[in-house]
Amino acid sequence: MTAIAPVITIDGPSGAGKGTLCKAMAEALQWHLLDSGAIYRVLALAALHHHVDVASEDALVPLASHLDVRFVSTNGNLEVILEGEDVSGEIRTQEVANAASQVAAFPRVREALLRRQRAFRELPGLIADGRDMGTVVFPDAPVKIFLDASSEERAHRRMLQLQEKGFSVNFERLLAEIKERDDRDRNRAVAPLVPAADALVLDSTTLSIEQLIEKALQYARQKLALA
């Protein structure tokens, strides 16, 4: 009988610390990593590389089904590898972002990418970072964590990130945008941003990164010992 690889899902809103936590857990456990938020950007970039029309659902589905992508975390840095090439920077361009929003609108593309994401489930295990990993993509995952933080704290973290990159930021505007996105994400009809019924909800508002990682790893190891 073939062993089924365990999955730890980390869901939650932007700015709660999912990316940092997932990279740390993947490195600590030496597990595979899935950054579901980057998947649509990677597909969009692959389409641009292969001159596939991003407005054609029929052309995109086979590309999505066989998308050659993997995620590697080394010393806290995430590398996105598309067809053997590090495209971590390339997927962050505005051209790719615009194309990603187009490809994400197609139902059959979303279905193909859902299957592709599930294919990341390989031994020894998978850390899945996203918004609906525990509710839609891996509903049978033995460990589910929903990571949250106050909208004010998430706006503050985002402001610091942008300031480090040299951008001038209005905190109140940033906070309003985050609250608006939260409301939209949590109330949408398809795959709303809510904790799975069996998820541990962790609030990172007052936790240091080290405390957050320790709590999550401790919980995961306890659950996996019982799984």
From Swiss-Prot:
ATP binds at G12, P13, S14, G15, A16, G17, K18, G19, T20. It catalyses: CMP + ATP = CDP + ADP; dCMP + ATP = dCDP + ADP. One of its GO terms (cellular component) is cytosol. Keywords: ATP-binding, Cytoplasm, Kinase, Nucleotide-binding, Transferase. GO terms for molecular function: ATP binding; CMP kinase activity; dCMP kinase activity. It is found in: Cytoplasm. This is Cytidylate kinase.
